[in-house]
Regions:
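N-terminal leader/targeting segments and the immediate start of mature chains
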Residues: 1-26, 164-171
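Positively charged, polar, low-complexity stretches
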Residues: 16, 35-42, 65
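C-terminal edge-of-domain segments
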Residues: 2-5, 120-171
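Short His-Asn-centered micro-motif
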Residues: 58-60
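Short, structured beta-strand-loop surface elements
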Residues: 64-128
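A short, Trp-centered hydrophobic/proline-enriched beta-strand micro-motif
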Residues: 19-36, 71-75
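Short active-site oxyanion
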Residues: 51-55
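A short, well-structured catalytic beta-strand-centered motif of the EAL phosphodiesterase domain
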Residues: 44-47
Length: 171
């Protein structure tokens, strides 16, 4: 079927998303609900392999995203060859055990009071749906770019619309 991928392709692209995000965990995140500020801002993802379809962010309680609500996050990999648009819900989840689990030196640099900093908020982004693109232009596609020509879809990479970013789904 044109424009649709086999399940194995979707599984591969979801796995690639989490690998690329672990390598470069920076996303643009913004609230999308009515009356919300419509601009996204950069946040550093804290990934927990035990949480499916969830990304955590440390932010100040005074951060405009800290109020939570419907949100979108955009991701571009370090090599600019993988892209993700994630839709979901952002909410504060100040679970001390999760803060301990995700805490690191980079986060500590932003919060002088450490894990008990009064301005510290752990934001939980629960992903409801995602659209993922991986650009892996084939050799023939690269030659067409260099010398002119039309790149066919099969030469340009992978694309998937998914309801879960879990790396595998039960049969």
């Amino acid at each position: 079927m044109a424009g649709q991928q086999a399940p194995t392709d979707k599984e591969a692209i979801k796995t690639t998303m989490w690998e690329r995000m672990a390598d470069s965990p920076y996303l643009m995140v913004g609230l999308t609900g009515a009356g919300q500020h419509q601009h996204s801002e950069p946040l550093t993802a804290q990934l927990d392999k035990d949480q499916v379809d969830t990304i955590f962010f440390f932010a100040g309680k005074d951060n405009r995203a800290a109020g939570g609500g419907e949100a979108m996050a955009q991701f571009v990999s370090k090599g600019h060859d993988f892209f993700a648009c994630l839709a979901g819900t952002l909410a504060q989840d100040n679970d001390p055990a999760m803060i301990d689990k995700l805490w690191n030196k980079q986060v500590e640099a932003w919060f002088p009071g450490g894990k008990s900093d009064p301005n510290l908020a752990l934001l939980r982004f629960d992903i409801d749906s995602a659209e993922l693109w991986e650009t892996d232009i084939s050799l023939s596609g690269r030659l067409k770019m260099l010398f002119g020509g039309t790149i066919k879809a099969a030469e340009s990479g992978s694309h998937a619309k998914v309801q879960t970013t879990a790396e595998s789904t039960p049969a």
